[in-house]
């Protein structure tokens, strides 16, 4: 069951977020699958993942707590990979699933931005926050529960900044005040800070999507009570 939608198919998130989710599933503290979409037009990684049924491996190499680590984590927590441009209707369907709880993003430091020429009628919109505003509005219209947003973009107060952009778009597009209330009261935008060295694509058997990283990782999340009850 898809509970997490991830904007970002790059090496970092696949070696970082999916490692947490995969481990949480294996340890029985979470039971959820991920759908991954790319925030931009380049579909190279998405297509490669589709060729492998969305499965790949993480190679963990380095020292952790004084021990030398050299192990492989097989990732099977990704259920679907979506082309944001070519499969926008499928992305919209995933965004409106009853089971969806969390949206993770890594759209680079420049990804959380407001572009006042973005229009509601564009599908998909240019900026990442505009895409989210339009998709979240569809979810709101269907009467679905709010979501927890976990942006990992390396900017200060990334959750707050994403929320500000979404509200700006809602006002620019003259969307109803009830939608803004939904954003403010039923969704959680968490500020996060992440730490893991991901060295990039790795060679492992015939896996074209394998990634390598250090074993150490840290994910600091400033969560409200609602988010705490959802984040594993």
Which residues are covered by each model-predicted region?
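Substrate/ligand-engaging "lid" and interaction regions
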Residues: 1-232
